Curated annotation (Swiss-Prot):
GO terms for cellular component: actin cytoskeleton; plasma membrane. Residues 177-187 have a biased composition (Low complexity). The keyword Oxidoreductase does not apply. It comes from Oryza sativa subsp. japonica. The keyword Repeat applies. Keywords: LIM domain, Metal-binding, Repeat, Zinc. Signal peptide: none annotated. Interacts with NEK3. Residues 8-68, 103-163 form the LIM zinc-binding domain. GO terms for biological process: actin filament bundle assembly. One of its GO terms (molecular function) is actin filament binding. This is LIM domain-containing protein PLIM2b. PANTHER family: OS06G0237300 PROTEIN.
């Protein structure tokens, strides 16, 4: 019995497709080298193509043609041939989840990426930067206190600002932008009075 080959014809070039070079997308046969974007002629892969009415596009041109322009005429506007310089557009929610972030840590002012991000009171922090500014204690969402954007653990906050069981003085300090209480130097004990009964020899 002899091998008769395949009867499949490539949809793009209408030539016979041999099994070794066969690529089938949506039940349609193509040569691997004919599986190209109809706009930019870039070679496509099974995970990087889209098609509309049997016309193949790379993901970029499919989005540009159908999603952004809203046109289903399969024609690009004159002068709109895309190159490496893509149109400036806001990334989709899915795309932005993988493309990074513009959020800056309120403590160190460096970029905060989603895996290390902690957001409290509208501010973003690195998990490692979310610590007490007085003692450096690592904070949790249930163990922190903040005054004018400065983070404290509840223990140090109480030690620094609590007076006689009330936080009323905090309103005054907050209004005057005073964050830490005034530091009063410890008084040195007074030298003992000279002993009058002592005689110098």
């Amino acid at each position: 019995m002899s091998f008769t080959g395949t009867q499949d014809k490539c949809t793009a070039c209408d030539k016979t497709v041999h099994f070794i070079d066969l690529l089938t997308a949506d039940g349609v046969p193509y040569h691997k080298t004919c599986f190209k974007c109809s706009h930019c002629k870039g070679i496509l892969s099974m995970c990087s193509y889209s098609s509309m009415d049997g016309v193949l596009y790379c993901k970029t041109h499919f989005e540009q043609l159908f999603k952004e322009t809203g046109s289903f005429s399969k024609k690009f506007a004159p002068g709109c041939r895309s190159t490496d310089k893509e149109l400036a557009r806001a990334p989709s929610k899915i795309c932005s989840a993988f493309s990074g972030t513009q959020d800056k840590c309120a403590a160190c002012q460096k970029t905060v990426y989603p895996l290390e991000k902690l957001t409290l009171e509208g501010e973003s922090y690195h998990k490692s930067c979310f610590k007490c500014s007085h003692g450096g204690c690592i904070l949790t969402t249930s163990s922190y206190a903040a005054l004018n954007g400065v983070l404290y653990c509840k223990i140090h906050f109480g030690q620094l600002f609590m007076e006689k069981g009330s936080y009323n003085h905090m309103k005054k300090k907050s209004e005057s932008q005073e964050v830490l209480p005034e530091v009063v130097p410890e008084e040195q004990p007074a030298p003992p009075p000279p002993d009058e009964n002592r005689e110098d020899n």
